[in-house]
Amino acid sequence: MKVIGITGTKGKTTSALMTAHILNKSGIPAGYIGTSGINYAGRTYPTVNTTPESLELQRIMREMADSGIRAVVMEVSSQGLYLGRVRGIDFDTVCFTNFSPDHIGGAEHPTLEHYAACKRKLFTDYGARCAVYNADDKMAEYMVGDFKGKRRISFSSSDAAANYLLTAAVPERSGCRLGVMGTVLHDGREYTADLPMPGAFNLMNALCAAGAAESLGVPADRSFAALADVTAAGRFQTVDALPGSGITFIVDYAHNGLALESALTVLRKYRPRRLICLFGSVGGRTELRRRELGEVASQLADFCILTSDNPDFEAPEKIIADIAASFKPGASCDYVRIPDRTEAVRYAVSIAREGDIVLLAGKGAEDFQLVNGVRVPYSDRDALLECAKATV
């Protein structure tokens, strides 16, 4: 069974889901392991960690192999590498999406350097045969510079020498649906990548996926054709909650300042009447993340709804207050505080009008809220559909 490992600060989930989608549509039965759970042979179930603990991971991979899966695409988190969860796995291909400050402090990484060094291990310590990497990222050379495998596949939006070069990205909007069409140069030939999800960064994820698929023998034309109907639950996922209303609802996992900035900047390109952002932040983590989320949303959204995320043992009101401290009267957008996330979603549905884009950020495809150490059933998508149904 071939094993593809994908690491990076952002884009792991979407790139991995895209890669598995391409392989499955190309006649290579593939499984997925990552933040969105475990998926193979028509089976889907959740996992606690992005990269499961060692014994659990080995059990899952054994089940996949016994079910006829020929390739597994796995998100490899920095914590997974730090704690040795993937030790003993023989990776065929390893991929690097990008790097930015995150997961520093608390129970995660003590320093940025430690965070980077853990990710780098995927390229130096696991004997992979091929490395696929984002040549635009300033940490690319650090990550893959000492890679000893036989093959490297690069992707870029600026480096003409890259194996996959994104030369154009055009936003597309049809009703409540958002997409993006890209032009890609590969091996002297031009390809079109037409994705049913917004954002040039998703085109970069698509290039990562195409490179990973190529490492297993899938040609580029087949990869880009397969991506025309790809979906990634909770990753810039359009939810048609109010059909015919002209309102676009997006559920996305953006949970730090950089990811939220990227999401809101992309959505601005679709020229919404108003850009409404509903978000919170997790408990038990650095307050820097809360400040960054507030700073970004207060400047890039037209209206914000501050609510709970996974508060755990912290009071949601305290987390919301930390976020709200970044909103400056006269210099920021207006906002409301609604600690109950379901009620916050209900409010978002009630104020949305034709032409608006409403972003529910932070939880993505998660099916729970972590409250006082307990996973309470909750889904942004389900809450959105239920609240919308009640308004009809």
List the model feature ranges, each with a label:
Residues 130-135, 276-279, 302-310:
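Short internal beta-strands
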Residues 246, 294-354:
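C-terminal helical cap/extension that packs against the catalytic core
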Residues 63-65, 69-104, 141-192, 225, ...:
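Extended acidic/charged loop-beta regions that coordinate divalent cations
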Residues 186-303, 325:
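Nucleotide phosphate-binding/pyrophosphate-handling subdomain across enzymes
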Residues 78-79, 100-102, 137-138, 171, ...:
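Short glycine-rich anion-binding loops that position phosphate/pyrophosphate groups of nucleotides
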Residues 378-392:
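Short, flexible loop segments at boundaries between secondary-structure elements
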Residues 113-117, 287-297, 320-323, 376-380:
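Charged helix-capping and loop-helix junction motifs
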Residues 1-135, 139-150, 207, 271:
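Phosphate-binding loop of NTP-binding sites
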